[in-house]
Design a protein with these regions (language model features):
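Conserved coupling/switch loops of ABC nucleotide-binding domains, chiefly the family-specific signature
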Residues: 81-84, 134, 234, 266
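ABC ATPase nucleotide-binding domains
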Residues: 56, 95-254
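Glycine/charge-rich catalytic "coupling/switch" loops of P-loop NTPases
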Residues: 2-13, 278-325, 349-380
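Conserved ABC transporter NBD signature motif
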Residues: 83-91
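Helix-to-loop junction immediately C-terminal to a conserved catalytic motif
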Residues: 75
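The feature captures the beta-strand-to-loop junction immediately N-terminal to the Walker
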Residues: 60-62
Length: 380
């Protein structure tokens, strides 16, 4: 599928034409109560969201959560059954993709194998009838922007996966769209290439100031690249927020467990500042929001389960190391703390200092401010 989609009026005005602007105080993109069904399956369930001009937003969630369906609805590729989409003050809800203002990059690159890199980048401009000289100039400028000036005469098969994705990105930008849509563009690449390219995409987005939406199931990718993350589950939005907010202050149990690693235990509020988990009493600032005796899920990040080296306030638990996974810069410990299964993450330096190995005892401390609580059905 062609990755250079945009309004014909912009093409006729020239590739450098300014995108339409929304009124002051209005969001650049407003998604209003979108619902999309495939037969009896509801892929999007009354979804609403606003995105500001120049933002980099990631749609994050597991397979089947609706993130790609939402992206495709914004593009007009899978139109919604209900709801509206307003872009730059214009209702695009019923417009075909060719009349919407966006460029899109797919996971599969979608490059034409029989065309050179230069021709691939300029394809959308040629199809809109722009002069050949203007097309080549624009295509070469974009190849320079993505660092591929010396690859213009090559064919896609002669490029690496990372280079092909850069070509697809350049082609998506050729029409100077107001919105860039990225549908899991890095998932087919090797790990090191993926990390490098996501940094390049973020730097390019900042340089151009283009409003960007990227779909991903990779939590680390979303945390590292997004201005805001939209966490989705079962066709609904669970939480919208900055990476730090979503990671440190998840609003639901699903977000807590999906974004990053999490220890999740069943407990009961024991008072204004503590929860009872098994035989342990764990100090928790969040307990003040619940009545005594309330069943809760008790959540603690592995990096917040720290060795007791003195001076750190919190609950101290005597534990035994049951397993150790060395991951280079960090080590992941599986602990048994008086019958409670806990995962802790330590820096390589801390691991070497403590000289830990399976079977050895370790006292850990959990700061009360780092304990998250979520309501729990008593039988759960």
């Amino acid at each position: 599928m062609d990755t250079t989609v945009g309004p014909r009026v912009r093409a006729e005005a020239g590739a450098g034409a300014a995108p339409p602007t929304s009124a002051p105080g209005e969001p650049y993109l407003a998604i209003c109560r979108l619902t999309k069904r495939f037969g009896a399956f509801t892929a999007l369930d009354d979804v609403s969201l606003t995105i500001e001009r120049g933002e980099f937003v990631c749609f994050l969630g597991p397979s089947g959560c609706g993130k790609t369906t939402l992206l495709r609805a914004i593009a007009g590729l899978d139109p919604q059954d209900e709801g509206r989409i307003i872009q730059a003050g214009r209702d695009v809800s019923a417009l075909p993709p060719s009349r919407r203002d966006f460029g899109i990059v797919f996971q599969s690159y979608a490059l034409f194998p029989n065309m050179t890199v230069l021709a691939n980048v300029g394809y959308g401009l040629v199809s809109q009838g722009l002069p050949r000289a203007a097309v080549e100039r624009r295509a070469r400028d974009l190849l320079a922007l993505v660092g591929l000036s010396d690859q213009a005469r090559k064919y896609p098969a002669q490029l690496s996966g990372g280079q092909q994705q850069r070509v697809a990105l350049a082609r998506a930008l050729a029409m100077n769209p107001g919105l860039l849509l990225l549908d899991e563009p890095l998932s087919a690449l090797d790990a090191l290439v993926r990390v490098h390219l996501r940094g390049e995409i973020k730097a390019l987005q900042r340089r151009l100031g283009i409003t960007t939406i990227m779909v991903t199931h990779d939590q680390e990718e979303a945390l590292s690249i997004a201005d805001r993350i939209v966490v989705m589950n079962r066709g609904r939005i669970e939480q919208v927020g900055t990476p730090d907010r979503v990671y440190r202050h998840p609003q639901t149990l699903f977000v807590a467990g999906f974004v990053g690693r999490m220890n999740t235990l069943s407990g009961t509020v024991a008072g204004a500042g503590a929860v009872s988990v098994g035989e342990a009493l764990i100090a928790a600032d969040a307990a003040s929001a619940y009545g005594s005796g309330t069943p809760v899920h008790v959540c603690v990040r592995p990096e917040d389960v720290q060795p007791d080296l003195g001076g750190l306030p919190g609950t101290r638990l005597a534990a035994t190391v049951r397993g150790l996974e060395y991951l280079g810069s960090i080590a992941r410990l599986e602990l048994d703390a008086s019958g409670l299964p806990l995962t802790a993450e330590l820096s390589d330096t801390a691991l070497r200092t403590l000289s830990l190995s399976p079977g050895e005892p370790l006292t850990v401390v959990i700061p009360p401010a780092r304990v998250l609580l979520f309501p729990r059905v008593a039988s759960a």
